Structures are given as C-alpha cells and as structure tokens.
C-alpha cells in the first residue's frame, strides 16, 4: 500500500496529537515548511529526517541578489523551537560574480515565524468542527 506522508487524523492514532502522520517529524511543520517556501526551487526534501534544502532563488524585483534556504524540522511535536531555518544570501559584485553576503539572523527568524504561523493554521484546520 505504500506509506502515509500526511494523514488527516491530526496524529490522533496513538501519536499523542503530534501530527507525525507516518513521517519522522511533525507533519504540520513539514507541510507548513513546504507551503512557506513553495516559490523556491527544491534541491532536497527528506520527510523522515526533516530536512528541506532549496536551490538558489533570485527575486524578480532584484537581479543582483539571490537566496538559498535550509529548513530543519527538529521533532515530532508542534513547538516554537521545532523548526530551524538558515537563509543564505549572495549578491553580485562589480564583475558579475556571486559573493556571499553577511548572514542576517533576522531573516532566519522571519522564515521560522512564517512556518510556525502556517503550521498553527494547518493544525487548527485539522481539528474536528464543533
């Protein structure tokens, strides 16, 4: 029958409501991560290890910078410390070569916050309606 990547039970079958749904990490955080970075090209996505790696993406409005993301889902529970994002940025120098820009921890936190907000929405939407 294959395996279940996402179930619609909200993780209620013996998983303590963790939303793990047949994968190695919290399925709400996993789905939210994919939703949040859907505009970026994926290089690798491992639902069992909880690792998502994107390729470089250049925003259409800025031809002189590009970004790459690594997202790590750190467990099976939906918690604020359950996701880590690392944003890498490169800019073009005067001869047109890409060079690494200084890291900005605020960008990392912004991506993490977006993922957490989406994960909460997914969890709320999965709860039975009263």
Residue map of PLM features:
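Ser/Thr-rich, low-complexity intrinsically disordered terminal regions
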Residues: 1-130
């Amino acid at each position: 029958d294959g395996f279940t990547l996402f179930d619609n039970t909200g993780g209620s079958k013996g998983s303590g409501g963790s939303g793990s749904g047949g994968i190695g990490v919290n399925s709400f955080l996993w789905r939210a991560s994919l939703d949040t970075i859907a505009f970026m090209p994926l290089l690798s996505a491992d639902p069992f290890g909880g690792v998502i790696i994107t390729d470089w993406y250049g925003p259409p409005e800025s031809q002189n910078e590009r970004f790459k993301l690594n997202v790590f889902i750190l467990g099976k529970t939906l918690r604020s410390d359950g996701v880590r994002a690392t944003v890498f940025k490169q800019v073009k120098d005067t001869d047109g070569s890409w060079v690494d820009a200084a890291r900005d921890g605020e960008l990392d936190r912004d991506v993490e916050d977006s993922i957490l907000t989406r994960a909460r929405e997914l969890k709320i939407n999965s709860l039975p309606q009263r």
